[in-house]
Amino acid sequence: MTVRDLGIPDILRHRGTLEVLDRDMVEGEAVKDIYLRAFTADVYLTSANAISEDGIIVNIDGNGNRVAAITWGPKKVIFIIGLNKVAQTVEAALSRARGTASPINAQRFDIKTPCQTDGICHNCNSPESICSYVHFLRNSRNKGRHVVVLVGENLGY
């Protein structure tokens, strides 16, 4: 939501010189096509659920498309991260991802999980769990592929 809240997809779309792959602009099977096409993108814009003070980026994903693209595929991955997502340790970053971002995402996507109901992570293993994939990015073997833009304000959740 950070990238969308900043209006970046609309800005890029209005330039008219780029193809913007945006799952929120399509429905049904076309969403899956966007997920697959993201692997061959020149640039993948995303945020993170959390980042530790020593730079470990933590993301939790329901389908795995985002963490897969972060790991492999697009030529460059740019993270735009607000200060509210910075945690002191990787353990605190994981706790933030599970306890803050996941319940909000479950509500956003209307996923029927315990956290969607009460906003508290129950570490559930429900078939609809939005926490199927937990991803830690601690370095990048491809120099320059991962770029972090840390914005000095609260962005996203």
Label every PLM stretch briefly.
Residues 37-157:
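Conserved phosphate- and dinucleotide-binding cores of soluble alpha/beta proteins
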